[in-house]
């Protein structure tokens, strides 16, 4: 895994999301003080999940076609999406957020 610096904790208030411009682009969410990172592109359509509708039960609804995903597992919870989103481990260290990304393949 390749650990990257995402942002300070203060940049993602509770109930909000932040787009992290890395490769791949990540959507970072704060749900009740817990942070979740998923692929920012909906698996059904070309929509940014960081612009989606965050629910208290750690799910996010795509802003384009209302597909819903679990932030913990990436599982698609309703149609029209059927494919999951990739999730990434998140670590908070000293007020900063880091995300583990897979190593780039040669």
From Swiss-Prot:
The keyword Transcription regulation does not apply. The keyword Transport applies. The gene is hcaC. [2Fe-2S] cluster binds at residues 42, 44, 62, 65. This is 3-phenylpropionate/cinnamic acid dioxygenase ferredoxin subunit. InterPro entries: HcaC (IPR023739), Rieske_2Fe-2S (IPR017941), Rieske_2Fe-2S_sf (IPR036922), Ring-hydroxylating_fd (IPR053387). GO terms for biological process: 3-phenylpropionate catabolic process. It comes from Escherichia coli O139:H28 (strain E24377A / ETEC). One of its GO terms (molecular function) is 2 iron, 2 sulfur cluster binding. Keywords: 2Fe-2S, Aromatic hydrocarbons catabolism, Electron transport, Iron, Iron-sulfur, Metal-binding, Transport. NCBIfam families: 3PPDioc_HcaC (NF042948), PRK09965.1 (NF007422). Residues 4-99 form the Rieske domain. Its cofactor is [2Fe-2S] cluster. This dioxygenase system consists of four proteins: the two subunits of the hydroxylase component (HcaE and HcaF), a ferredoxin (HcaC) and a ferredoxin reductase (HcaD). The lineage of its organism: Bacteria, Pseudomonadati, Pseudomonadota, Gammaproteobacteria, Enterobacterales. Pathway: Aromatic compound metabolism; 3-phenylpropanoate degradation. PANTHER family: 3-PHENYLPROPIONATE_CINNAMIC ACID DIOXYGENASE FERREDOXIN SUBUNIT (PTHR21496:SF23), FERREDOXIN-RELATED (PTHR21496). Binds 1 [2Fe-2S] cluster per subunit.
């Amino acid at each position: 895994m390749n650990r990257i610096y995402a942002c300070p904790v203060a940049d993602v208030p509770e109930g909000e999301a932040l787009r992290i411009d890395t490769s791949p682009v990540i959507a970072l969410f704060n749900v009740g003080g817990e942070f979740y990172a998923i692929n920012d592109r909906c698996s059904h359509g070309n929509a940014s999940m960081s612009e989606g509708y965050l629910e208290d039960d750690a799910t996010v609804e795509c802003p384009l076609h209302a597909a819903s995903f679990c932030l913990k597992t990436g599982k698609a919870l309703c149609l029209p999406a059927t494919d999951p989103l990739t999730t990434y481990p998140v670590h908070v260290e000293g007020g900063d957020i880091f995300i583990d990304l897979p190593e780039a393949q040669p």
